[in-house]
């Protein structure tokens, strides 16, 4: 009797799973074909614009999201208070390559989210190009100390799924400054995480982990065209110098909100 009961429960569970699976698929299908997702994304991206955590635009996005969700048939929509990091980019960043005194090439850069600033005059030093954190570790302090580390591993275009290509390259952006600081680097430049060849630096966040503030080094993304130029010039002039200036800063955490919509069932 016990075995029969277990078998009945098993088949009921399978049946419920099948129903749940169909409901979930229907929701996805509806979202792709009938929803306002693209118009919402357009408004969020182009009308509200950049939404760094703790910023005025981020608060506008919270208010707008709740307003839109209130129009839909949810049982409850509410705001959940949360404190978020508040980092500001400051004035436009500046960088140049100096192959020899008086001969320079400007390159597009942008500070990585969460990075510390350079001194007001910037940092200027020789460059060590690496393709991975493992390569950085192999070079060690003797070859890294006092220099700017240039992480230049491109995303792999052979991956059909772009996000897979991104995932296999983004460690150098997220962890590059943390790892390079261990070997005495004074700054980090990271190739932008994109398959495009252009002059627009693509930023993103980094982490310093538990590294004391006094040991944190500035980090910036360089455009893919800029990265190719720097790499090419390093082959000709290995002793060239790189100047980076950025004035970003970390402010106290700010109040923000998670926007939550609940549908009971």
Stretches with model-predicted labels:
Residues 26, 36-39, 43, 60, ...:
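Extracytoplasmic/secreted proteins, especially bacterial periplasmic and envelope-associated proteins
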Residues 131-197:
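A conserved hydrophobic secondary-structure block that centers on an alpha-helix together
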Residues 21-55, 200-204, 208:
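N-terminal capping segment at the start of a domain
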Residues 21-23, 98-100, 106-141, 208-265:
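Soluble metallo-hydrolase cores and metallopeptidase-like ectodomains found primarily
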